[in-house]
């Protein structure tokens, strides 16, 4: 599990971030801090992997907290979630190692993309000791080999495909259903079926029919690891 600290002085926003976080597998909330000092206290009490950091706070702000963490060489990652849209602030947080930056107000889909991308990279770090340039480009920097541009079928979008594929990856090698994905992504089952059909057509997913407790057929999907690269040209 990835241990998370939310640093947010607005209780309503803090609770919203908490609720959003609870909908994404692989993350565990260790605390919510409303100030610079309370954040340092929680960091001293718990092992934290990721901070969801607001910038504007009374007293010392989030940027000062980020600066302090880097001065102490703390091995913690930061995703900024703030109303601060000034380019100077954004540039400074990125220089200090923020891995993503969400400007309030934001949609759940953007939040989920940020967290899912972070989780994916942590998985890469935990399963590799060395990487080739090709692996580094593909796995961390999301650079793609020069290929002929491939269009998605009509009615499908790259952003939704990315979101659904990220959710599919969270199941790892476990089977899943359309309903499972709908709960993860908050996308309708009707829409999800279109994307699953596409992934089945390009042989990235395997599908089997099973029967539920009341006898109705249920389609169980799992990733076809032998052809997993087939999706890259569409993302």
From Swiss-Prot:
Phosphorylated and activated by MalK. Its main location: cytoplasm. It holds the Pfam family Response_reg. InterPro entries: 2C-system_Tx_regulators (IPR051271), CheY-like_superfamily (IPR011006), Sig_transdc_resp-reg_cit/mal (IPR024187), Sig_transdc_resp-reg_receiver (IPR001789). GO terms for molecular function: DNA binding; DNA-binding transcription factor activity; phosphorelay response regulator activity. The modification 4-aspartylphosphate is found at residue 54. Residues 178-197 bind DNA. Coiled coil: none annotated. It comes from the Bacteria. It is found in: Cytoplasm. Residues 3-119 form the Response regulatory domain. PANTHER family: TRANSCRIPTIONAL REGULATORY PROTEIN DCUR-RELATED, TRANSCRIPTIONAL REGULATORY PROTEIN DPIA. Member of a two-component regulatory system MalK/MalR. Activates transcription of maeA, maeN and yflS in presence of malate by binding to their promoter region. This is Transcriptional regulatory protein MalR. It comes from Bacillus subtilis (strain 168). The lineage of its organism: Bacteria, Bacillati, Bacillota, Bacilli, Bacillales.
């Amino acid at each position: 599990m990835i241990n998370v600290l939310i640093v947010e002085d607005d209780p309503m926003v803090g609770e919203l971030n908490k609720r959003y976080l609870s909908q994404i597998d692989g993350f565990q909330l260790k605390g919510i801090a409303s100030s610079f000092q309370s954040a340092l206290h929680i960091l001293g009490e718990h092992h934290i992997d990721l901070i969801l950091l607001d910038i504007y706070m009374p007293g010392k702000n989030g940027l000062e907290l980020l600066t302090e963490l880097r001065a102490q060489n703390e091995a913690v990652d930061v995703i900024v979630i703030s109303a601060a849209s000034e380019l100077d602030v954004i540039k400074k947080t990125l220089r200090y190692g923020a891995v993503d930056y969400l400007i309030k107000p934001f949609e759940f889909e953007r939040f989920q993309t940020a967290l899912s991308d972070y989780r994916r990279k942590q998985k890469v770090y935990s399963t590799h000791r060395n990487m080739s340039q090709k692996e580094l480009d593909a796995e961390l920097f999301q650079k793609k080999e020069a290929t002929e541009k491939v269009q998605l079928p009509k009615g499908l979008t790259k952003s939704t495909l990315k979101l659904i594929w990220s959710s599919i990856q969270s199941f790892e090698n476990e089977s899943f259903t359309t309903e499972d994905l709908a709960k993860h992504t908050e996308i309708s089952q009707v829409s999800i079926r279109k994307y699953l059909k596409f992934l089945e057509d390009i042989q990235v997913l395997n599908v089997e029919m099973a029967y539920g407790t009341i006898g109705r057929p249920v389609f169980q999907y799992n990733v076809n690891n032998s052809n997993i690269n087939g999706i890259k040209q569409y993302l």
